[in-house]
Amino acid sequence: MRKKILFYLLALFIFSCNRNEFSPNQKFDATTPEDVNAREISELSKKTAGAHIRIAVSGDTHTDYTDSKGFVDYVNSQDDIDFVVLNGDITNFGLLTEFQGIYDIYNKLKVPFITVLGNHDENAEGNFVYQRMYGSPNFTFDYGGIKFVCHDANSREHSFDHTTPNLDWLRMNLSKDEGTQYIMAFSHVPPIDADFDQTLRSGYENLFNSTPGMLASVHSHRHSADSIYRANGTGIPFIITNTILNKTFTIIDITNGQLTTHPVTF
Amino acid sequence: MANLLRTLLLFNILPLLLCSVQTARAQSKLINTLIPDQLIMQYAGSIGYISGGIGYNLWKEKSTLSFHFGYVPKNKGGELDIAAIKLDYKPFTIHIGDQLIFHPINPVAFLSYTFGQEFGFEFDSQVYDKGYYFWSPALREHLGLTSELKILGDGSSKIKSISLYVETNTNDLYAINWYHDKKGIPFTDIFRLGFGLKMNF
């Protein structure tokens, strides 16, 4: 009888775990997808944008798979969302298995999803994992006459060496592409946060405010109810959205360059 | 691992050096203590694509303490260098015929340390306030189970027996993620497999 139980336990633990692993820190394995952002942007470009654009902005999933699935199910039940943004902090520890866990869930979205790099995602080999899996942390894409500028604003992960956010790269890319009238930015850490390089803050805010056609800069990171601020009380809105951990995301509607937002709890 | 080995050696060698009178017997005893009881090769198991190690039997072969060094090549998700120390315990022994000994379920605990720039023992205190990130990027604590089949030799070779084992393990960070979302992350999903071979002397 004892032997039977032992054999049963043995079979259970061998067959229940199905994965070899070389290290929790390995940068990829045989099944890891590559260049997901490029693929999703290509999918998005096949869509025809209407007069109203609706974006579902989610952030800070960390490894809350349950609520991430809840979010994906909610978005899939809607038919008016153009695309989804996952605005950083996909992981807790920057580990491959965490990136893959969230990818597997977001990949079930019926609409394209664009993934931005968060501060937690830069831990250990996370930066490399992200770049192989999703692509460059600084990238742009166009949809519905709007140029979206996504970038790494996780200054603390770069030891506040004044390279992040990369203002030179932003200056070059904050110009309208052919066929776009407006520009919108996505990055994880908001300028008002202590994790943002405060020596770059005013330069960053001024750059956005002096960019013609700039609509808004959208951030997450703070795990709190949606808030909007304007630098010195004027200029474009800096929008800080909630976290999937709170079962909440933010809808951004854009019509003729007019932008409105509202949180949705699912 | 280098440090640990050094400590181990120092603790064994220092007393001998301090003694002015050494007997040949003591020397041979020391050498016998230091010669490992096992050479170990392992595939995967979270300490390298391939890893090699030496093991020492404890408590009448009920337990093994082993030291490993693992490597993940660039084309397998590296490059990573990893050192590990393992301690296992074999509570059950099942004899199958004359030549096979089966240890079906053996708890194992190990520490792994990943070398390299991205892996500080802790986060840089110049950049992060204490507790900003609570974990060590380099040091992982693992718990797992192994199952081992020992094939006995006929006594004619220096290698007394060969053991084949399969090991499943999880680590502190995977366990934390599971703890925070038990519904979304099945318990078995946090375990990873490795396979190994031991030559027992």
Can you describe what each PLM-predicted range is?
Chain B
Residues 1-30:
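Bacterial Sec-dependent N-terminal signal peptides
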Residues 29-32, 50-64, 81-92, 193-199:
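Feature captures outer-membrane beta-barrel proteins of Gram-negative bacteria and organelles
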Residues 33-46, 52, 62-73:
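Transmembrane beta-strand segments that form the barrel wall of outer-membrane beta-barrel proteins
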Residues 36, 47-49, 80-82, 140, ...:
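Membrane-spanning beta-strands of outer-membrane beta-barrel proteins
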Residues 37, 50, 70-76, 92-94, ...:
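Sequence/structural signature of outer-membrane beta-barrel proteins
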Residues 57, 63, 69-71, 75-77, ...:
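Outer-membrane beta-barrel domain signature
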Residues 75-110:
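Mid-chain, structured segments of secreted extracytoplasmic proteins
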Residues 96-201:
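Outer-membrane beta-barrel transmembrane domain signature
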